[in-house]
């Protein structure tokens, strides 16, 4: 898996926490950081999926990551989990805010409670995770936060208003906290994935016609997979990117440009 991936010496033994690590992009992030020799911890919404990711890491010859199920919408429980990770593994030096869901919803069907839930699931926990880990990160000499965004809001994707609003907010959060935390040597950047092929997307939303639409809209005629997202995430986590903060890096094969030129 890692044969064509750069090795970053600064990530060896570094404590990394990834939310939403039980499947899709998150699972690939867990495997990729473990292959760098990092000390990885992650959470998923339920106990399902997490143990299989741990087993895949061990089978590849790397140290077993630490996993706990957690609903990131429960801020108190989530911050308590982050505290336990810090006590067990040491100060979290890399935080990857990844958990979220792009459930489709027509505007007419959205209730106030559903809207609040979408924001809670796709944005709110990012802030409170950073709030929880920043003191320890700063005391350890600094660190890196990577927020996972989405190109969907840049393209104005329909039937996703709660999701796209939250994902647009991630850019504002990233830039504000990059300014606020820079004096503590904490960098805050965002990765903005495009049409990534994951198990969930394939099961719910992808078919040959949809795949072709994405390819037609992309500058690069390739199928993006979680590895395309993991590789630049490793770079932003490593000391090699220590001059970068407040940035959003698109990993979308150029699909965002389609909304500009069409």
Pin down the residues of each PLM region:
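Active-site helix of classical SDR
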Residues: 130, 166, 174
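Alpha-helical segment proximal to the catalytic Tyr-Lys
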Residues: 135, 179-183, 242
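Residue(s) in the substrate-gating loop at a strand-loop-helix junction
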Residues: 150
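Short C-terminal tail/terminal secondary-structure segment
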Residues: 2-7, 155, 234, 245-262
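Substrate-binding pocket helix/loop in short-chain dehydrogenase/reductase
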Residues: 106-107, 111-119, 214
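Conserved glycine-rich Rossmann-like NAD(P)H-binding loop of the short-chain dehydrogenase/reductase
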Residues: 38-52
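Conserved glycine-rich cofactor-binding loop
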Residues: 15, 22-23
């Amino acid at each position: 898996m890692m044969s064509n991936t750069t090795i970053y010496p600064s990530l060896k033994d570094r404590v990394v926490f990834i939310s939403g690590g039980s499947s899709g992009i998150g699972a690939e992030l867990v495997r990729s950081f473990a292959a760098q020799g990092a000390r990885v911890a992650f959470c998923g919404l339920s106990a399902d999926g997490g143990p299989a990711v741990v087993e895949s890491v061990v089978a590849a010859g790397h140290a077993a990551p630490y996993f706990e199920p957690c609903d990131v919408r429960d801020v108190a429980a989530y911050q308590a989990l982050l505290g336990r990770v810090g006590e067990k593994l040491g100060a979290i030096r890399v935080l990857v805010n990844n958990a979220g869901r792009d459930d489709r919803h027509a505007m007419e069907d959205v209730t106030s409670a559903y809207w609040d839930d979408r924001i809670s699931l796709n944005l709110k926990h990012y802030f409170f995770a950073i709030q929880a880990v920043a003191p320890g990160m700063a005391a350890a000499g600094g660190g890196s936060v990577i927020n996972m965004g989405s190109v969907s809001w840049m393209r104005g994707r329909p039937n996703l208003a709660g999701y796209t609003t939250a994902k647009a907010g991630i850019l504002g959060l990233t830039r504000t906290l990059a300014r606020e935390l820079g004096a503590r040597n904490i960098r805050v950047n965002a990765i903005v994935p495009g049409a990534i092929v994951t198990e969930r997307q394939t099961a719910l939303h992808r078919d040959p016609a949809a795949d072709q639409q994405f390819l037609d809209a992309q500058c690069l005629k390739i199928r993006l997979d979680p590895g395309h997202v993991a590789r630049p995430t490793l770079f932003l986590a490593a000391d090699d990117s220590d001059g970068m903060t407040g940035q959003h890096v698109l990993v979308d094969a150029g699909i965002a440009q389609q909304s500009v030129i069409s």
